[in-house]
């Protein structure tokens, strides 16, 4: 784990990504999260294991380039996002959708 997120592991994971592809990956015990763009794989692993009490077997990350956005005559950039696909050990699962 890097020094940046020591003691602040809850700040690493922003939100789960619920897309068609991510939903299909749930069947393979893979969960997709939007994470802080400065987080390294050890940070993400430690955060998921601590927050959800599961065992992580692997992580794949994607850091796509920022996209430009125009509003009238003003140009800007969208916030930088980093996606992480987390593979869990057999028998581990994360409850993303609460049962009611």
Swiss-Prot record:
Q: Which molecular function GO terms apply here?
A: rRNA binding; structural constituent of ribosome
**What biological-process GO terms show up in the record?**
translation
Q: Which PROSITE patterns match?
A: RIBOSOMAL_L23
Q: Which InterPro entries match?
A: Nucleotide-bd_a/b_plait_sf, Ribosomal_uL23-like, Ribosomal_uL23/eL15/eS24_sf, Ribosomal_uL23_CS
List, alphabetically, the GO terms of the cellular component aspect: ribonucleoprotein complex; ribosome
Q: What are the record keywords, sorted?
A: Ribonucleoprotein, Ribosomal protein, RNA-binding, rRNA-binding
Q: Which residues form a coiled coil?
A: none
- On whether Ribosomal protein is a keyword of this UniProt record, the answer is yes
Subunit structure, interactors included: Part of the 50S ribosomal subunit. Contacts protein L29, and trigger factor when it is bound to the ribosome.
What this chain does, per the record?
One of the early assembly proteins it binds 23S rRNA. One of the proteins that surrounds the polypeptide exit tunnel on the outside of the ribosome. Forms the main docking site for trigger factor binding to the ribosome.
| Entry similarity comment | Belongs to the universal ribosomal protein uL23 family.
Official protein name in the record = Large ribosomal subunit protein uL23
Species, as recorded? Synechococcus sp. (strain WH7803)
